[in-house]
């Protein structure tokens, strides 16, 4: 419990550091912005790293992403408040990871696109998986959720385009690694964790780009539900998905999107 309190306090401190008085307004106006969190302008993705200054905390670091007006928001500020999901997930009783994911994506810290999805997918799966287990086999979520958050935060924004590996799909592998206690020296679990990520990446890739963090998160979660049932023998609830945010994505693929319209 101490660790949970520290995470919540830390999230509050980080949010305060990243948000001055004038920044509160943009947060309220752009809680689900599909583009720049500062001005709403379209994002630009560069070919090479350029040193940029975060418009919120003013930290300078290399990045390939900014908006057309030059605004850059670092991953730390972009995901401020993310640690609050620990309390949410500990109180959650659903065995449906899509339901858990939707609750987290509805919070102000989650934007249309962004590296927060690299954490949320794994956290939703871990929570629903644990709820689907018999009481005698339950995990220690108070320890495992912060681990998922820590690992997910290491996957940078734009990994789908710049590394050829969608962070939402990688998050399924993070989830699998945590529940199987996998390490680089493991044998059977090493295979399972990499296979999980590969299956999710395949599903994401088959639907093509441009990226949509919402679509790719849904696809990754649904793939993981089937994978866990087959390989771990644990059955989570699998809900039908119909995205309610398609119109907020300027680069959406329209009728080609498997989770828009009639859903999947």
Regions found by a protein language model. Give the residues of each.
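Sec-dependent signal peptide recognition
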Residues: 2-8
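C-terminal motif of bacterial Sec signal peptides marking the signal peptidase cleavage site
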Residues: 15-17
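Residues immediately within or flanking Cys/His clusters that coordinate Zn2+
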Residues: 33, 51, 64, 71, ...
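Short, cysteine/histidine-rich loop/knuckle motifs that typically chelate Zn2+
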Residues: 37-38, 56-59, 66-69, 76-79, ...
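Cys/His-rich microdomains that often coordinate metals
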Residues: 43, 61, 73, 81
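Polybasic, low-complexity association/targeting segments
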Residues: 92-125, 210, 214
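Conserved phosphate/anionic-ligand binding catalytic regions in large, soluble enzymes, centered on
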Residues: 117, 158-178
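A structural-propensity feature for long, helix-poor, extended segments
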Residues: 179-180, 185-229
């Amino acid at each position: 419990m101490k660790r949970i309190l520290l995470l919540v306090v830390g999230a509050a401190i980080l949010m305060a550091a990243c948000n001055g008085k004038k920044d509160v307004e943009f947060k309220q106006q752009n809680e689900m912005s599909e583009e720049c969190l500062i001005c709403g302008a379209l994002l630009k993705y560069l070919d090479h790293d350029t040193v940029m200054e975060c418009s919120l905390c003013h930290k300078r670091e290399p990045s390939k992403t900014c908006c057309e007006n030059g605004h850059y928001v670092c991953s730390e500020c972009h995901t401020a408040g993310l640690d609050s999901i620990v309390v949410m997930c500990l109180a959650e009783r659903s065995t449906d990871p899509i339901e858990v994911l939707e609750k987290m994506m509805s919070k102000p810290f989650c934007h249309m696109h962004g590296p927060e999805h690299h954490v949320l997918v794994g956290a939703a799966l871990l929570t629903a998986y644990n709820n689907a287990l018999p009481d005698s086999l339950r995990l220690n979520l108070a320890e495992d959720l912060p681990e998922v958050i820590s690992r997910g935060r290491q996957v940078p924004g734009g990994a789908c385009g710049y590394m050829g590996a969608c962070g939402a799909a990688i998050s399924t592998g993070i989830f699998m690694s945590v529940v199987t206690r996998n390490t680089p020296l493991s044998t059977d679990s090493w295979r399972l964790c990499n296979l999980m990520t590969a299956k999710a990446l395949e599903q994401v890739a088959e639907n093509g780009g441009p990226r949509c963090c919402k679509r790719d998160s849904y696809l990754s979660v649904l793939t993981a539900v089937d994978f866990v049932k087959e390989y771990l023998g644990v059955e989570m609830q699998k809900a039908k998905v119909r995205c309610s945010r398609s119109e907020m994505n300027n680069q959406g693929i329209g009728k080609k999107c498997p989770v828009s319209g009639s859903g999947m």
